[in-house]
A protein has these predicted regions:
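Basic, helix-initiating cap at the start of DNA-binding domains
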Residues: 1-33, 41-46, 63
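C-terminal peripheral helix-coil segments that are non-catalytic and often amphipathic
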Residues: 1-6, 86, 102, 131, ...
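Conserved hydrophobic residue
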Residues: 36, 146-147
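Short hydrophobic/aromatic patch on the recognition helix
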Residues: 47-58
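Alpha-helical DNA-contacting segments of helix-turn-helix folds
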Residues: 58, 64-72
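Hydrophobic alpha-helical connector segments
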Residues: 67, 78-106, 156-159
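Amphipathic alpha-helical packing segments from all-alpha helical-bundle domains
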Residues: 74-77, 119-145, 153-161, 168
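Short linear capping/connector segments at secondary-structure termini
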Residues: 112-120
Length: 196
């Protein structure tokens, strides 16, 4: 009896390639029409795939955005944890902001424009990035480096208001300023405001 060669790797490769085609097509359409203005049918038509194939790769259009956030969380949390060792809380916040700026620069203006839509649930979720920052702020408050008269939640909200606001403005201004430099300047002000 001849040996049967399994095909999962090839099927996986096809699925992975199809997911990437769908993702790239969706990002292009969403950059032009926005998240809300782009339908799954339009994505499938532009990618030349059946609608069923889309749903084999993604549960919904929202899953495409989830991929961006998951990759961002993995990048920041995976990279920063090694470098953050030995830094005080303020140093860790500054390091986080550098990685956040770098991530958004790498993500690019077109994709960021897709992410900034009013009902984006991930802006209010307790993502790994926010969990990391929560640990930094809690540690900084316990150690006396960060003001304790402000709530940790308030500090974290303020930090993400600043970071997201700068990224949003970067998109509106079509990348007319250096994102990393702008974030660093605002982080200097933010850190001065929360330091004891």
């Amino acid at each position: 009896m001849p040996e049967v060669i399994p095909k999962p790797k090839r099927a996986y490769r096809k699925t992975s390639e199809t997911q990437q085609i769908i993702f790239d097509t969706a990002m292009t359409l969403m950059s032009e029409k926005g998240f809300q203005g782009t339908t799954v049918r339009e994505i499938c038509a532009a990618a030349c795939i059946p609608v069923g194939t889309f749903y084999n790769c993604y549960k919904s259009k929202v899953d495409i955005l989830r991929r961006i956030y998951d990759e961002g969380d993995a990048y920041i949390c995976g990279s920063i944890s090694r470098e953050a060792e030995g830094l005080d809380a303020i140093g860790q916040l500054r390091l986080f902001s550098e990685y956040y700026a770098r991530l958004n620069e790498q993500t690019g203006i077109e994709v960021l424009r897709v992410l900034f839509y009013p009902s984006n649930e991930w802006f209010s979720m307790n993502r790994p990035m926010q969990v990391f920052i929560r640990k930094v702020v809690d540690s900084g408050q316990r150690g006396g480096a960060i003001r304790s008269d402000l709530s940790a939640d308030g500090i974290i909200d303020c930090l993400f208001d600043i970071l997201r606001g700068i990224c949003y403005n970067w998109c509106v201004c079509n990348g007319a300023f250096d994102l990393s430099i702008r974030i660093k300047a605002h982080m200097d002000l933010f850190c001065a405001a929360i330091t004891t």
